Amino acid sequence: MSTKSSSIHGRNEVKMEGEKRKDVESESTHVTLNVKGQDEEGVKVFRVRRKARLLKLMEYYAKMRGIEWNTFRFLSDDGSRIREYHTADDMELKDGDQIDALLPQESGFGPSTVFRV
């Protein structure tokens, strides 16, 4: 699966793991992040620039799922919420860190008729 997201300067900011890199850069400028949704078994692996806003990753993940990006709540390993303006450096994310993509929990019914006081 080939996935790319281009930036203003024509460089790729989000790449799926395993894709060949066209430009030669230092490994320390990128970080590999695992994104896991609460309702799916697999983990999506993304390679992003440390200084790039994580909005690109959020938008691409949401597009793959067919849901608006702002519907998800993205959380880091320590439970901190990741906002669209954060970068991997801001959140101190390291290679292999997992980001949880959670959907809001909604209930579908009113007061219980089973327990009456």
From Swiss-Prot:
Region entry Disordered, spans: 1-30
Location of the protein in the cell: Nucleus; Cytoplasm
Record CDD domains: Ubl_SUMO_like
Placement of covalent cross-link Glycyl lysine isopeptide (Gly-Lys) (interchain with K-? in acceptor proteins): G108
One GO CC annotation: cytoplasm
Sequence ranges of Basic and acidic residues compositional bias: 10-28
Family matches, as InterPro entries: Rad60/SUMO-like_dom (IPR022617), Ubiquitin-like_dom (IPR000626), Ubiquitin-like_domsf (IPR029071)
Domain called Ubiquitin-like: residue spans: 31-108
Keywords: Cytoplasm, Isopeptide bond, Nucleus, Ubl conjugation pathway
Principal location: nucleus
Role, per record: Ubiquitin-like protein which can be covalently attached to target lysines as a monomer. Does not seem to be involved in protein degradation and may function as an antagonist of ubiquitin in the degradation process.
Subunit structure comment from the entry: Interacts with SAE2, SCE1, SIZ1 and MMS21 Covalently attached to a number of proteins.
Membership in a protein family: Belongs to the ubiquitin family. SUMO subfamily.
Additional remark text: Stress conditions rapidly and substantially elevates the amount of SUMO1 and SUMO2 conjugates with a concomitant reduction in the amount of free SUMO proteins. The SUMO conjugation system plays an important function in stress protection and/or repair.
Protein name: Putative small ubiquitin-related modifier 6
